[in-house]
Amino acid sequence: MKKLLTSLMLSTASFMLLLTVSNKAYAYEETETFTFEIYNMNSVVANPGLYNYLVDLTDGYGYGQMQHVTVDISLLDYNTAYLEKNLNGFNLFFTSDTGVYEFGIDASGNIELLNDPVAHDEYSLTFTGLNNAYQDLFYEEIVVEFEIVSFDSLEGVGTLDPNPYVVLSELLTENYEYNETIAPFIWVNDVQYQNYYSVYDIGSDLALIEIDGPTLNIYSDRFEEYNETFDVGDEFRIIFKIYKTWTQAHDYGRIRTNASTLYLNQQSDTSALLSHSESTNVINVNNIAVGDEIVMQSPYTDFSVSYGNVGFPRTYLVEQENIAAVKMIKNSSDNTNYTFILFYWENGSVVSRTVNNINLANRNSLNIKFDGGFRKALNYSDVMVANVDLLTPLEDFLPNMVAWDAIDGDISDSIVITDNDGYSPDTVGIYNVEFSVTNSNGQTSSIIAPVHVVDIVNPVINGVSDTVHISYDQTFNVTNWVNSLTVSDNYYTGLSISIKENTYTVNKNKLGTYKITVQAVDPSGNIGTLTRTIVVNDGIGPVFNGINTITASINENITVEQIKAGLAAIDAIDGNVTTSIVVDSDNLTGKANTVGVYEVVFRAVDAAGNQTFHTVTVSIVASPPGFYILNSNSVRLLPGANLTIEQILNILNASDAENISTNYTVSVPGTYNLSFTLYGESHQVSITVLGQNDSIIPTPVIPGESNPGFNITYALIIGLSAIALLATTVTILNKKRK
């Protein structure tokens, strides 16, 4: 054999498992190289671990071409390479422009170059494939076995038992659910034969055999290269290796097993192993032999395995997020020892964890629960949302789509939009857009995904929003303010404004800071708000109680402090603020012995700084000593002032009074009433004869406080609104009564 390559060739190919979790695909694979040398013209001895490695690599299941294993070999210039598993070991095929090189690997690790060997050529084999503990479950190998029970001729017709026609015809029909069927392989009496159309259920010039109902048609001339003859009793084994895409794969999870008592897609009275559209599988653990393995795999991130009996609570063996697969191995016949190998996602990779010595004794069932429901080969990762303001084209969502095919691998770049459902990026709504992808075999998968065109911008409320400062005795008109506002929106029109919160109205007479918030809500649920702050403050000054006018004799020498003592200041918020009263202006002091009219202005202030001014008019008259006239309607006589009614009327400027009535007693302390008519108007006057300890000017009564020394005499202003002295300075008249 001519040496074409002298250096080691490492395979750069890899097989991607048909399994995606959260938009990721993974190839849980390993690579190993074996070197050997041909010592003679027909056989060599390989690395002893090669056979066991290949068994682990293919996980020991099924026969036929191992499509999920890639092979590379030095010294050969070849186009394709593939690995087959047969009944006794493995075959390696390398096709080139000059022919096919075939190696055989038996269970002892021997490698035999079956054609064109050259002694002392050194070869290296590099295998890349699935790890021994983890296997792609999204393909199947279906074995059909039958025996010839009669045969008419070497070229002709035989009959079969059992009749495999139904199974084979279904497998070879285009409408069958399987996505890709690798050409079947035929074993006759444990000898393998291969032809692209090895088996057919209709006429074909290439078929080795035809199955027509129970009839077997054998084309011996097509077996000539194998020097095969056939007869009654010959045993046939036909193996189909079938790949599935997600759209045609089982809806939930898949299960593989080498347990002879458990069959894929079948259910018996004693055990069930379902790998079609069922979310729950129940396995009778008593029907599993020691050494049997069951591998459970799901295209979803989660599923659970539990065990239990009737009457016993279910106990979970496996319940973990991001589980990709579980492998179970039975180690003891009494069910006391099982091994579970968990494969799960961690930091973007699949890792494994082994749990040993799981005891399933006294438990009659293993319950496998696949969660999540059916998911197609074509999938999308997130809710697809477009902002109506950005005018997003549908093509921008293609990176959100993921498509995987059993043969082609990642075909996400081939996804196209097949129906846009009238998608309009400037119109809010939900559009059910159809996306499709077609693999290299011409098969198409589709998915309808909702694309949401949304408005995410809040309305804007326009208007005055500065802080309002208002006194508690005033009212801010909320309605007028709301009516003055306008609203604008990026998409909708005709939005209304409503009050969302109003803490002011119910507290408008209480000092404090309050807020009024209005809102506008558009049909997309976006909310725009505007808040105005209302500060209710104290804008009202105190109210003075007490005297307004005083008439006094020049002999009394009245002082400002005496007048101040007759005043009080009450604030609606702060209450009694009398202590805040001060003299603001004074033209009386120093003139109390001089006849004239003077004014003293007092000022009171509350805690808010509001000021109130109060003027007391003081008239100094040249009359008999011993009296004061307060507010024109209260005469206060000092001890020893023995004035008569006539004198009192004179100092009241009412000497012309008529209809005089009084209970006044001269020099006797007490309070008396005086009534009279002056120029047709009635008047009431209080006369107080003071005792030695009485105040000259009474202290005003403070609401809520007791003041027995005053008797509210100054309140008798009621009914005296017309007296001439009320608004003018009091002077003494000497006009005689008519």
UniProtKB/Swiss-Prot annotation:
Subcellular location: Membrane
InterPro entries, sorted: Ig-like_fold (IPR013783)
Topology of this chain in the membrane: Multi-pass membrane protein
Signal peptide range in chain numbering: 1-27
Keyword entries, A-Z: Membrane, Signal, Transmembrane, Transmembrane helix
Transmembrane segments: 612-632, 712-732
Protein name as it appears in the record: Uncharacterized 81.3 kDa protein
